[in-house]
Amino acid sequence: MTGNLRTFILMAALTALVMGMGGLIGGRGGAVIALAIAGAGNLFAWWNSDKMVLRQQGAHLVTRQQAPELVDMVAALAQRANLPMPKVYVLETEQPNAFATGRNPENAAVAVTQGIMRVLNRDELAGVIAHELAHIKHRDTLTMTVTATMAGAIAMLGNMLMFSSMFGGRDDNRGSGLAAILAMIFAPMAAGLVQMAISRTREYEADRMGAEICGRPMALAGALAKISRAAGQVVNIPAERNPASASMFIVNPLHALRMDRLFATHPPTEERIARLQAMASGAPASGPWGAR
């Protein structure tokens, strides 16, 4: 199953959960209203999420005059990826990490930390930036915004269902009391699992395309190894304050976080590196980035 097909199926599952929760609360009309509420939330998040996350992370915009090597690298890789030049931001944290945001390729941004520019060499940093550009090209920033909003809507509907059950609910509600209780408990959990599964799928796809953009799969593999080792040793305070943003980063930024794979926002780093190593045996047609 391709990554895009898997994402489509998981998104369909989230939509079904939203409508199912709405249906338990208010029948067919409730399902439609729940979907409309989720749609309105998605529209708001689509327009504002990039500004919100950049502000939460304390990112500041940099120009070519301030960071010529970084901005030139982003420009060269964006050209290889056939993308408009994104805005470039720097985060004032020593944890090596990076993320992309923006509602579409024309309004996108790439953010890197101070730490990543110190820890990685030139080719490794190019691999990370190429990974983030792959997210932009795939419109993963939009996908993850939608999934986060829908997961939040399901949690809200779960609370509404709890109060509806407590105070009697509708007489013609086709869901039994037991079904309502089970949905109230398990639907938000299922939504979270689906959200995390989508996040992991998009990371694999971004690794693959990022390696194609930069032309150096082993450079990206080396970057992932270095970032993963350092992420558990250096605290990223803005990310710790906003843990919902963890899935945006190339490696989970939360300090000393060990979770079951089912609940992980990112695939195991070892598996990501193994896939990149398998790619390294075939040279991209475009050749490696930065080759002279």
From Swiss-Prot:
HAMAP family reported for this sequence: Pept_M48_protease_HtpX (MF_00188)
Cofactor: Zn(2+)
Keyword Cell inner membrane assigned: yes
CDD domains referenced in this protein's UniProt entry, alphabetically: M48B_HtpX_like
InterPro entries (UniProt xref): HtpX_protease, Pept_M48_protease_HtpX, Peptidase_M48
Name used for this protein in its record: Protease HtpX homolog
Recorded superkingdom: Bacteria
Keywords: Cell inner membrane, Cell membrane, Hydrolase, Membrane, Metal-binding, Metalloprotease, Protease, Transmembrane, Transmembrane helix, Zinc
GO function terms (MF aspect): metalloendopeptidase activity; zinc ion binding
Family: Belongs to the peptidase M48B family.
Gene3D superfamilies: Metalloproteases ('zincins'), catalytic domain
Membrane-spanning intervals of the chain: 7-27, 29-49, 148-168, 178-198
GO biological process, any: proteolysis
Active site positions, chain numbering: 132
Free-text comment on the cofactor: Binds 1 zinc ion per subunit.
Pfam family, one: Peptidase_M48
Lineage: Bacteria, Pseudomonadati, Pseudomonadota, Alphaproteobacteria, Rhodobacterales
A GO term from the CC aspect: plasma membrane
Binding-site residues for Zn(2+), renumbered to this chain: 131, 135, 203
Membrane topology: Multi-pass membrane protein
Organism of this sequence: Paracoccus denitrificans (strain Pd 1222)
EC annotation from Swiss-Prot or TrEMBL: 3.4.24.-
UniProt keyword Chaperone present: no
Compartments it resides in: Cell inner membrane
